[in-house]
Amino acid sequence: TDKDSYNIAKAFEEAFHILKCPIDNYEILDDRPLKEIPKKLEALLPGKTIVLNIIKAVPEEIPFRIKWIFKVEENKKIKMGHMPGITEGMMLNSVNVDFERMKQTAIFLHKSFLNAEKLHITTEEGTDIFLGVKDRIFSNDISIKAGEMCNLPCGEIYCAPLESEADGVIVFNASIGDIGVLKYPLKVYVNKG
């Protein structure tokens, strides 16, 4: 964790104490942005089964985060919750959900995509895109197995569409990763992928 995400990490720590789960914390101090995995952080990995990345989203740290994810995934026993940029509002409104209900909805949606060849996605904000998905594998991040990771908040069902079969417009009107909340909608026009 870090000073910006301390309260969220503390909430997880309190929950783990209630569950009698042993924990180790690593706090990133002011040495930002991280470029490499700190040795003391890496030294905490042996014997762990859960790793939570509760940190401020610093765009310049994306290469570090990728290295860290790969390092954690080397141990096929660890489940990782990845939360760069998580806020208390996200914890209260997006993470505080009925996960069993979310999982059942994801299973239903996943089944509905089996054998799909093309998706047509529209929104009131103006997204109108066709995606070719024939023979693509759909995944979700609702439940993970040892050796896997997911972002929190979670709830995604996704696949990699065919690279040459995407046509239309996508409207981004909320937040984009580490960039934050957009002031104005961003339209991206896609032609043949």
Language-model segment annotations:
Residues 188:
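Hydrophobic/aromatic beta-strand elements that line small-molecule binding cavities or substrate pockets
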Residues 1-169, 174-178, 183, 191:
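Active-site bordering "gate/hinge" segments
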